[in-house]
Amino acid sequence: MKTLSIDIETYSSVDLAKCGVYKYTEAPDFDILLFGYSVEGSPVQVVDLACGEMIPAEIIAALTDTGVTKWAFNAQFERICLSRWLR
């Protein structure tokens, strides 16, 4: 795997616009609800984490693999949210 495109949908009771991404992700109820991904431009797969679906192990591994280029529309937000979620 050389490239991974990602998009997430999240929830937090903290107002993102007022408090910023770090406070948003530090809220006890912060969660990633949906995780969309595409490997090497393949059709997009959506994982419904809110309903108990699991992100495939190879995708989790790719998130921390420095040899895989990650793409996201709001990369800094996605990076911070995923870093918090992966703890």
Language model features with spans:
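Conserved DEDDh/DEDDy metal-dependent 3′-5′ exonuclease domain
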Residues: 2-5, 10, 15-19, 26, ...
